[in-house]
Design a protein with these regions (language model features):
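C-terminal terminal-subdomain/extension
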Residues: 1, 57-106
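Short linear motifs in intrinsically disordered
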Residues: 1-2, 44
Length: 106
């Protein structure tokens, strides 16, 4: 299965704790790249700030967490091991707004 934009996948890096990440890169580019743009999640230090988007059980997650748009990075696609959930259009709109704040592109 190939990751697609809006999907949350488990990112398993060697010698590090596995954690969910949101695929942010447009789906058309994912297949041809080895690294794809993702947003990590956190359950620690969750704050209500403009660059965090909260996701929870209603979004298909096991526990509440925050997508941290300030920490967006390029992940190796082969380290995304299984899909957890797919975020809806409304939640992805929140992600896009938070990304605009994180990058000062608003």
């Amino acid at each position: 299965m190939i990751p697609a934009r809006g999907e949350v996948w488990l990112h398993e890096r060697p010698k590090r704790k596995a954690r969910p990440v949101l695929v942010l890169l447009r789906s058309e580019a994912v297949e041809s790249l080895n690294r794809i743009l993702v947003v990590p999640t956190t359950t620690e230090g969750m704050r209500r700030i403009p660059t965090h988007v909260w996701i929870d059980e209603d979004d298909g997650m096991r526990e509440p967490c925050a997508l941290t748009l300030d920490e967006t990075f390029a992940a190796r696609k082969d380290l995304l091991t299984h899909r957890i959930t797919v975020l809806g259009a409304e939640k992805m709109h929140e992600v896009c707004l938070a990304l605009a704040v994180a990058t000062s592109c608003s």
